[in-house]
Amino acid sequence: MIFVAVGTQLRFDRLAEAVDMWCKEHPEREVFGQLGPVDDGGYRPRHYNWTDALTKAEFDVNLEQSEFVVAHAGIGTILTALLKQKPVLLMPRRSELAEHRNDHQLATVRRFEDTKGVFVANTPADVGSQMDYLCSTVVATTVLNEFSDGPLVKYLQKVLGEG
């Protein structure tokens, strides 16, 4: 199963639609998405199952059962996927497209783009090609755990003021 997660506060129509177009071409693949609030006119996928929100326990179960994660560039989702050693495909929200108030997600993907197991899609077309790649390849991920002291964790501690 492929798990799509866009966070709970904002919908992410560009990513939801890109995954939906990919699913239309790959009906044999099981995909489940957590898409945020779509009741205000947001994109509603027709080719995969989805919900607006999940409890933490439901999120964890879906993440655990997934082959890989397709997500916005939210730091919580990235770290959770890496902790579970799941490859993650990130598409950053962009302020110029009114997807967020600023471009911090672009900075996030720049920081993680060289991390083993992290893939970046800057356009909807990239989402499809990266999903094709992830479905056809065994991908190694960065080994990260809650006790890690590697460069990534040290960097995050520095940024968060904990190191």
Predicted regions: what is each one?
Residues 1-163:
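Nucleotide-activated sugar donor-binding and catalytic core shared by glycosyltransferases
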